[in-house]
Amino acid sequence: MNKFKRSSRRRLPPIRSGEIIDYKNTSLLRRFISEQGKILSRRMNKLTSKQQRLVTVAIKRARILALLPFLNNES
């Protein structure tokens, strides 16, 4: 017997097919940043490796242009 059950329900992808991963799209990029301001891992995001690379580059560009903070000090 297998202890772990897989759900038959298919999860929605975190990035829909129409969404473009761009450094100007800060509302999309904020979903992939932790409360401390760190970039979340691929396992937590459920992204493909290509999507994770694009998200990482976009977040880093947005940080340099001051669209996203490097650290989240709102505590």
Curated annotation (Swiss-Prot):
PROSITE patterns: RIBOSOMAL_S18. HAMAP family: Ribosomal_bS18. It comes from Anthoceros angustus. The keyword Calcium does not apply. It is found in: Plastid, Chloroplast. Pfam families: Ribosomal_S18. The gene is rps18. Belongs to the bacterial ribosomal protein bS18 family. Part of the 30S ribosomal subunit. One of its GO terms (biological process) is translation. This is Small ribosomal subunit protein bS18c. Keywords: Chloroplast, Plastid, Ribonucleoprotein, Ribosomal protein, RNA-binding, rRNA-binding. Its main location: plastid. The keyword Oxidoreductase does not apply. GO terms for cellular component: chloroplast; mitochondrial small ribosomal subunit. InterPro entries: Ribosomal_bS18 (IPR001648), Ribosomal_bS18_CS (IPR018275), Ribosomal_bS18_sf (IPR036870). One of its GO terms (molecular function) is small ribosomal subunit rRNA binding. PANTHER family: 30S RIBOSOMAL PROTEIN S18 (PTHR13479), SMALL RIBOSOMAL SUBUNIT PROTEIN BS18M (PTHR13479:SF40).
